Every structure is written in structure tokens, then in C-alpha cells.
């Protein structure tokens, strides 16, 4: 059973680099307050680290 995490966009990416905005889009986050649930993989963790100052992460019980 894979561990799931919920990623929520809590800060606007306006004024931050284009790379960080692309990472947010690839995570599936568009608008402030939007949330997505992903498997906790190393690639997702790397994307979260790139924009950690813009998102909130929490574990989801499956």
C-alpha cells in the first residue's frame, strides 16, 4: 500500500521563477488553495522541495 500525501498551494507563485511555476503546474496546482493527492515518491518529493515555500504538505490516511 503506497503512502499518499496531500499538497496544497498556500502562497501565490507570482514573482517567483518560471521553473517553480512549471513545477507547481506539473504537480497539478493552479489556483490558491487548490489541493492534490499524490503517491509519496522520490520524484514528487523533489518537486515539493523545489517549491516548499509555496505549498503545504500533509500525510493522507488511505
UniProtKB/Swiss-Prot annotation:
GO terms for molecular function: structural constituent of ribosome. Keywords: Ribonucleoprotein, Ribosomal protein. InterPro entries: Ribo_uL30_ferredoxin-like_sf, Ribosomal_uL30_bac-type, Ribosomal_uL30_ferredoxin-like. One of its GO terms (cellular component) is cytosolic large ribosomal subunit. One of its GO terms (biological process) is translation. Coiled coil: none annotated. SUPFAM superfamilies: Ribosomal protein L30p/L7e. The keyword NADP does not apply. The keyword NAD does not apply. Belongs to the universal ribosomal protein uL30 family. Part of the 50S ribosomal subunit. This is Large ribosomal subunit protein uL30. The lineage of its organism: Bacteria, Bacillati, Bacillota, Clostridia, Eubacteriales.
